[in-house]
Swiss-Prot record:
Catalyzes the conversion of butyryl-CoA through butyryl phosphate to butyrate. GO terms for cellular component: cytoplasm. Pfam families: Acetate_kinase (PF00871). This is Butyrate kinase. InterPro entries: Aliphatic_acid_kin_short-chain, Aliphatic_acid_kinase_CS, ATPase_NBD, Butyrate_kin. PANTHER family: ACETATE KINASE (PTHR21060), BUTYRATE KINASE 2-RELATED (PTHR21060:SF3). GO terms for molecular function: acetate kinase activity; ATP binding; butyrate kinase activity. It comes from Clostridium beijerinckii (strain ATCC 51743 / NCIMB 8052) (Clostridium acetobutylicum). Its main location: cytoplasm.
Length: 355
């Protein structure tokens, strides 16, 4: 059976929506919000009615009959840690999204708007594989400092989507495979997927792992402590070096990996040195995650925007193909991944989880 779905993915200055019939996109729109519009609201939750109205108006303009929808799917927000999967949006989830139990983020509005529209139409509302997806093995949580446990913050939606896609295309099923999935975008996450669970992954936001176009990844801890107490930097400035101004931005003042590779190929030695370190660190992280899986790796998967690179992918393959064969699913399609999560539940392939 084919279901019509409205997908809602709120970002800080835009709301991306898509209408799908099954896995086929009928249309997609990015609704941009000006600073003036956003500034009117004190909190992210205060933007709820405004964003909902904008979405409904666009659907009306497109003469789309919302009564034909089977379900609404929102981007999962900063909830309490949960295992991966598709969740029915309930009142407890909405309350946690309102207050942002793990921090304020525009994606918190995804589930709230989805439930509001879904309830009015008397159809289900879901979120899929939120960024707080946490399936870490207990042994992976210990960092070496009791007050600083390792956290699971990664590109869960895309990592899970491509892992399940490979499971389907290979005919083996995600739950029967050991995979190392590497998402390469503004941040880089390398996850060990053990029979359907991400048992270890670097905290790709502000934790550890390879550096990325904008993030520092793991850094020498003693020197970081000295930097914090040197009196030269505020907390925000140090954090900025980790997130936003780390990685390629820190070294080369750009987050454009393709541009860096182009310069390297024209003979720029500094670009070459940073690029080689980038490849080295990602390869090292893949090796680390293959040890987590005790060397039993069925496939390594590269995904995210940087996986389009005709230079980087072969360079990474050369370093890691001895561990396992490599599959490349470049880019990320968050709206489709959200649609697929809902379809698996509506088709009875998976059960909706309860928050």
């Amino acid at each position: 059976m084919s279901y019509k779905l409205l997908i809602i993915n709120p970002g800080s200055t835009s709301t991306k929506i898509g209408v799908y019939e099954g896995e086929k996109e009928l249309f997609e729109e990015t609704l941009r919000h000006t600073n003036e519009e956003i500034k009117r609201y004190d909190t992210i939750y205060d933007q709820f009615e405004f964003r909902k109205e904008v979405i409904l108006n666009v659907l009306k303009e497109k003469n789309f009959d919302i009564k034909t929808l089977s379900a609404i799917v929102g981007r999962g927000g900063m909830l309490r840690p949960v295992e991966g999967g598709t969740y029915a949006v309930n009142d407890a989830m909405v309350e946690d999204l309102k207050v942002g139990v793990q921090g304020p983020h525009a994606s918190n509005l995804g589930g709230i708007i989805a439930k509001s529209i879904g309830d009015e139409l008397n159809i289900p509302s879901f979120i899929v594989d939120p960024v707080v997806t946490d399936e870490l093995a207990d042994v992976a949580r210990l960092s070496g400092v009791p007050e600083l446990p390792r956290k699971s913050k990664f590109h869960a939606l895309n990592q899970k989507a491509v892992a399940k896609r490979y499971g389907k295309e290979s005919g083996q099923g995600y739950e029967n495979l050991n995979l190392v999935v590497v998402h390469m975008g503004g941040g880089v996450s390398v996850g060990a997927h053990n029979h359907g669970k991400v048992v270890d992954v670097n905290n790709a936001l502000d934790g550890d792992g390879p550096f990325s176009p904008e993030r520092a990844g793991s850094v020498p801890i003693g020197d970081l402590v000295k930097m914090c107490f040197s009196g030269k930097y505020s907390e925000a400035e140090v954090y900025g070096k980790a997130v936003g101004k780390g990685g390629f931005v820190g070294y080369l003042n750009t987050n454009d990996v393709k541009g860096v590779i182009d310069k390297m190929e024209e003979g720029d030695k500094e670009c070459e040195s940073i690029y080689k370190a980038f490849v080295y660190q990602i390869s090292k992280a893949i090796g680390e995650m293959s040890v987590v899986l005790e060397g039993k790796v069925d496939q390594i998967i590269f995904t995210g925007g940087i996986a389009y690179s005709p230079t980087l992918v072969p360079d990474l393959k050369a370093k890691v193909e001895w561990i396992a064969p490599v599959t490349v699913y470049p880019g990320e399609d968050e709206l489709l991944a959200l649609a697929q999560g809902a379809i698996r539940v509506l088709d009875g392939e998976e059960q909706a989880k309860v928050y």
